[in-house]
Amino acid sequence: MMAKVESQTGDLNEKLIAVNRVAKVVKGGRIFSFTALTVVGDGNGRVGFGYGKAREVPAAIQKAMEKARRNIRDVQLKGNTLQHPIKGRHSGSKVYMQPASEGTGIIAGGAMRAVLEVVGVQNVLSKAYGSTNPINVVRATLDALENMNSPEQIAAKRGLSVNELLG
């Protein structure tokens, strides 16, 4: 079950990506519980995701939001797009994202779109390959965003100036 809910607390945008009912089979029958996948971000290069499980939907969402707020990471953006084309993978999911010109918008599907919206990317072209399981797509997207470097970071690693690096 895919759901999208947006809310704002303080300076963070929160998005609910997916709610899923899961069952534990026991001798007396099935015990149902719920899982929730959420992302939070400040729209300015900070993003985190959370995965919560509980017997009731609101409790699962609340747990996921708390985990997402504790799990915030920084991403180096270039204005409102990416620094350079990037690939990310997690488990069976692979994602490819590339910067886009002003006015393109977010061309991404499902879970990837939610992550890119809360991190503050406004122009991007992206594609998910392999498994489109929302949890793995979110993790692959965050993997790609974390591995993205600005020209300043790359120049510092190589011991060059930015002008020498860019030629």
From Swiss-Prot:
InterPro entries: Ribosomal_Su5_D2-typ_SF (IPR020568), Ribosomal_uS5 (IPR000851), Ribosomal_uS5_bac-type (IPR005712), Ribosomal_uS5_C (IPR005324), Ribosomal_uS5_N (IPR013810), Ribosomal_uS5_N_CS (IPR018192), Ribsml_uS5_D2-typ_fold_subgr (IPR014721). One of its GO terms (molecular function) is rRNA binding. Residues 12-75 form the S5 DRBM domain. GO terms for cellular component: small ribosomal subunit. PROSITE patterns: RIBOSOMAL_S5, S5_DSRBD. Keywords: Ribonucleoprotein, Ribosomal protein, RNA-binding, rRNA-binding. GO terms for biological process: translation. Pfam families: Ribosomal_S5 (PF00333), Ribosomal_S5_C (PF03719). The N-terminal domain interacts with the head of the 30S subunit; the C-terminal domain interacts with the body and contacts protein S4. The interaction surface between S4 and S5 is involved in control of translational fidelity. With S4 and S12 plays an important role in translational accuracy. Located at the back of the 30S subunit body where it stabilizes the conformation of the head with respect to the body. Part of the 30S ribosomal subunit. Contacts proteins S4 and S8. Belongs to the universal ribosomal protein uS5 family. This is Small ribosomal subunit protein uS5. It comes from Psychromonas ingrahamii (strain DSM 17664 / CCUG 51855 / 37).
